[in-house]
């Protein structure tokens, strides 16, 4: 059976910014960035299915379906329409998204959904993969790295992606305090404070003997948006304080523009223990959390 006669499905994992250096605002209002990115496993991911149809449609289910929406502003539909336009295809698809990742949370959920849509539809419609690669930057800064799906160094406005396959896989716990953190205001606060004045690209990471050496090197880096995000959403600070107090944690930091934070752990058992502690704490019952291996996208 050809791909045109069957449905395809794939995971859209969380994107974790292990560090994020942000330059000053450019004339276009955007910023040059440098970030080391890894992806969660299927235990911390959305799931997308695409099947042949006459037109394009999207349905969304799952705990964060209402926040994501299924309208024209959903990046999955935007990606599908952009791919139709770029390729000239008249084919359609029925898209079904299970939304397990929190929205506007600093882990690139919408961008990962869009990248997965591009991958699935490229196969379903039997298109040249270069169409998806070319249009990805126009969908958002995180879409190119999500489309690559590999541990990568992300530079420029997100369009310069360098895979780093030699990085050791690590284990992490992801935690979101259940409070939205607005990306635009966080960047504006960063800019108003003179952030990015000394921005310069650093050398790519060296080879590491293991997770501890990797975490030690990451500890010399930073997330430039962490302080302005905490100023707007103090709960982020509470999450980081909690994570840093857990056994087996090598590094705790915010991802992206927040509010999701992560802790790299010596082993998966430590990450799972942290999720269990949260699950049994009534004061943290509204926190979203997941334990996962970080590496290439599933």
From Swiss-Prot:
SUPFAM superfamilies membership: GHMP Kinase, C-terminal domain, Ribosomal protein S5 domain 2-like
Chemical reaction(s) catalysed: 4-CDP-2-C-methyl-D-erythritol + ATP = 4-CDP-2-C-methyl-D-erythritol 2-phosphate + ADP + H(+)
Active site per UniProt: 15, 142
One Pfam short name: GHMP_kinases_C
Segments passing through the bilayer: none
Any single biological process term in GO: isopentenyl diphosphate biosynthetic process, methylerythritol 4-phosphate pathway
Any GO molecular function: 4-(cytidine 5'-diphospho)-2-C-methyl-D-erythritol kinase activity
EC class (word): transferase
Pathway(s) per entry: Isoprenoid biosynthesis; isopentenyl diphosphate biosynthesis via DXP pathway; isopentenyl diphosphate from 1-deoxy-D-xylulose 5-phosphate: step 3/6
Disulfide bridge positions per record: none
EC number, as in UniProt: 2.7.1.148
Positions annotated to bind ATP: 102-112
Entry keywords, A to Z: ATP-binding, Isoprene biosynthesis, Kinase, Nucleotide-binding, Transferase
Record has Chloroplast as a keyword: no
Biological role stated in the UniProt entry: Catalyzes the phosphorylation of the position 2 hydroxy group of 4-diphosphocytidyl-2C-methyl-D-erythritol.
PANTHER family from the UniProt entry: 4-DIPHOSPHOCYTIDYL-2-C-METHYL-D-ERYTHRITOL KINASE, CHLOROPLASTIC
Family: Belongs to the GHMP kinase family. IspE subfamily.
Protein name per the record: 4-diphosphocytidyl-2-C-methyl-D-erythritol kinase
Organism: Hyphomonas neptunium (strain ATCC 15444)
Primary gene name: ispE
């Amino acid at each position: 059976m050809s791909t045109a006669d069957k449905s395809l499905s794939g995971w859209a994992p969380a994107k974790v910014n292990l560090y994020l250096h942000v330059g000053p605002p450019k004339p276009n209002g955007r910023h040059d960035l440098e970030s080391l990115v890894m992806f969660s496993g299927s235990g911390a991911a959305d799931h997308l299915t695409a099947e042949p149809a006459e037109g394009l449609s999207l349905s969304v289910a799952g705990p964060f379906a209402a926040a994501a929406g299924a309208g024209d502003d959903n990046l999955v539909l935007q990606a599908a329409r952009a791919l139709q336009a770029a390729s000239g295809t008249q084919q359609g698809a029925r898209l079904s998204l299970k939304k397990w990742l929190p929205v506007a949370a600093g882990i690139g959920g919408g961008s990962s959904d869009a990248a997965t849509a591009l991958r699935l539809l490229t196969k379903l419609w039997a298109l040249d993969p270069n169409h998806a690669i070319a249009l990805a930057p126009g969908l958002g800064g995180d879409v190119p790295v999500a489309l690559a799906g590999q541990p990568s160094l992300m530079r420029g406005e997100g369009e310069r992606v360098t895979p780093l396959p030699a990085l050791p896989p690590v284990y992490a716990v992801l935690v979101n305090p259940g409070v939205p953190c607005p990306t635009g205001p966080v960047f504006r606060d960063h800019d108003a404070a003179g952030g990015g004045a000394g921005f310069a690209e650093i050398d790519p990471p060296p080879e590491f003997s293991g997770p501890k050496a990797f975490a030690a090197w990451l500890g010399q880096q930073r997330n430039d948006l962490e302080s302005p995000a905490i100023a707007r959403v103090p709960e982020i600070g509470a999450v980081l304080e909690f994570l840093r107090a857990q056994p087996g944690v090598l590094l705790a930091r915010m991802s992206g523009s927040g509010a999701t934070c992560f802790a790299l752990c010596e082993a998966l058992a430590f990450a799972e223990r942290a999720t269990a502690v949260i699950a049994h704490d009534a004061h943290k019952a509204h926190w979203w959390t997941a334990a996962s291996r970080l590496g290439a996208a599933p």
